[in-house]
Amino acid sequence: MRLTPAEIAAIKAAARQAFGETAVVRLFGSRVDDSRRGGDIDLHVEVDPPIDEWRARTQFEAALFSRIDPRKVDVVVTERGMQPRAFERIAYRDGIVL
């Protein structure tokens, strides 16, 4: 996994702040593979419904970028209990829980 301990801590803290204490954050995509280089940070966040996704995403990014250097971060949000879409199934299958 190509994230530093400080980045992991920042992601988890920002997710708790924006999405709540029960949010589960997974890293997926190229950053999971230590042999690859570059790439954005792909995060899957599983949350308890209901959620104001727009507000929570904005709050998450603000909290995250106050803790780490801004960079390309893609966030996929899934409400717990909902049928995952194809892209979300990849995150569940290949992702690493932070």
Region annotations inferred by a language model:
Residues 1-26, 32-38, 48-98:
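Catalytic core of pol beta-like nucleotidyltransferases
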